[in-house]
Amino acid sequence: MNPKSPLFLRLSDRLDVYLRLMRADKPIGTLLLLWPTYWALWLASDGIPDLAVLAAFTIGTFLMRSAGCVINDFADRDFDGAVERTKNRPFAQGRVKKKEALLLTAFLCLLAALCLIPLNHLTWLMSLPALFLALTYPFTKRFFPIPQLYLGLAFSFGIPMAFAAVAGNVPPQAWILFAANVLWTLAYDTVYAMADKEDDLKIGIKTSAVTFGRYDIAAVMLCHGGFTLLMAVLGAVIGAAWAYWTAIPIVLLLQYRQYAAIKSRVRQICFETFLANNRIGWVWFTAIFAHTFFAK
């Protein structure tokens, strides 16, 4: 195909728009979804997850995160132009139609559903509330004072699904990990919301940063503390090997550094601090991986 032909240019433009809607160039959301899913897969499988299951969750997570981003932009299409961080998104620039976004969301969800084929029926069943949470989260910002808590539920459903896929049931430790991840998500996404706080106040969007007001930093650190405490409880429940416990001082140090950074409430620093949570996810995965290795 001639790269200068109108058809090629049209297809290239649509592909660029769709990839931007999916945040394909910003993998942080996928990583923050994958880490807790991997924690669960490694714990449930004693460190040896089936490759087909691992691939299904990895690809499915990417696809559902992408679908969530598209429906989020659809839901926020009337607001993104007024927010500094989102003013260049496709809807804000008038580059995409509502029908396109909805069809792209449906297509991505269909592809994600295909990832369930090698998994058991319990996992299929648990995918239904996961899908509901993922697709409805963006609309909670209109009426729910802490939509980041709702996002925490959506971002944590990979945990019971992973246990269901590997073990055929969802044991108590899965729900401890679920609760821990809800708190972690609430912590880092409140920091994310702090970057947009001034704009959100102007347009009337509800976020945890707006709801917590001047206590936003205290709320973030309380959630971080609860997250780490529950990870310690999880370690006690599973009889974690010594390697697991090395994560706690490292994570506490990373959390303190986040506290020191967000005290300024500077927009860019808050955004960079949000990105830094990827390190916490990696540290805990390394600790769980090491636990399963040394526990054998």
From Swiss-Prot:
<comment type="similarity">
    <text>Belongs to the UbiA prenyltransferase family.</text>
</comment>
<dbReference type="InterPro" id="IPR044878">
    <property type="entry name" value="UbiA_sf"/>
</dbReference>
<dbReference type="InterPro" id="IPR006370">
    <property type="entry name" value="HB_polyprenyltransferase-like"/>
</dbReference>
<dbReference type="InterPro" id="IPR039653">
    <property type="entry name" value="Prenyltransferase"/>
</dbReference>
<feature type="transmembrane region" description="Helical">
    <location>
        <begin position="28"/>
        <end position="48"/>
    </location>
</feature>
<dbReference type="GO" id="GO:0008412">
    <property type="term" value="F:4-hydroxybenzoate polyprenyltransferase activity"/>
</dbReference>
<keyword id="KW-1133">Transmembrane helix</keyword>
<feature type="transmembrane region" description="Helical">
    <location>
        <begin position="274"/>
        <end position="294"/>
    </location>
</feature>
<comment type="function">
    <text>Catalyzes the prenylation of para-hydroxybenzoate (PHB) with an all-trans polyprenyl group. Mediates the second step in the final reaction sequence of ubiquinone-8 (UQ-8) biosynthesis, which is the condensation of the polyisoprenoid side chain with PHB, generating the first membrane-bound Q intermediate 3-octaprenyl-4-hydroxybenzoate.</text>
</comment>
<protein>
    <recommendedName>
        <fullName>4-hydroxybenzoate octaprenyltransferase</fullName>
        <ecNumber>2.5.1.39</ecNumber>
    </recommendedName>
</protein>
<comment type="pathway">
    <text>Cofactor biosynthesis; ubiquinone biosynthesis.</text>
</comment>
<dbReference type="Pfam" id="PF01040">
    <property type="entry name" value="UbiA"/>
</dbReference>
<feature type="transmembrane region" description="Helical">
    <location>
        <begin position="174"/>
        <end position="194"/>
    </location>
</feature>
<feature type="transmembrane region" description="Helical">
    <location>
        <begin position="51"/>
        <end position="71"/>
    </location>
</feature>
<keyword id="KW-0460">Magnesium</keyword>
<dbReference type="InterPro" id="IPR000537">
    <property type="entry name" value="UbiA_prenyltransferase"/>
</dbReference>
<keyword id="KW-0808">Transferase</keyword>
<feature type="transmembrane region" description="Helical">
    <location>
        <begin position="102"/>
        <end position="122"/>
    </location>
</feature>
<keyword id="KW-0472">Membrane</keyword>
<keyword id="KW-0997">Cell inner membrane</keyword>
<keyword id="KW-1003">Cell membrane</keyword>
<dbReference type="GO" id="GO:0006744">
    <property type="term" value="P:ubiquinone biosynthetic process"/>
</dbReference>
<dbReference type="InterPro" id="IPR030470">
    <property type="entry name" value="UbiA_prenylTrfase_CS"/>
</dbReference>
<keyword id="KW-0812">Transmembrane</keyword>
<dbReference type="GO" id="GO:0005886">
    <property type="term" value="C:plasma membrane"/>
</dbReference>
<feature type="transmembrane region" description="Helical">
    <location>
        <begin position="233"/>
        <end position="253"/>
    </location>
</feature>
<dbReference type="GO" id="GO:0016765">
    <property type="term" value="F:transferase activity, transferring alkyl or aryl (other than methyl) groups"/>
</dbReference>
<feature type="transmembrane region" description="Helical">
    <location>
        <begin position="212"/>
        <end position="232"/>
    </location>
</feature>
<feature type="transmembrane region" description="Helical">
    <location>
        <begin position="143"/>
        <end position="163"/>
    </location>
</feature>
<keyword id="KW-0831">Ubiquinone biosynthesis</keyword>
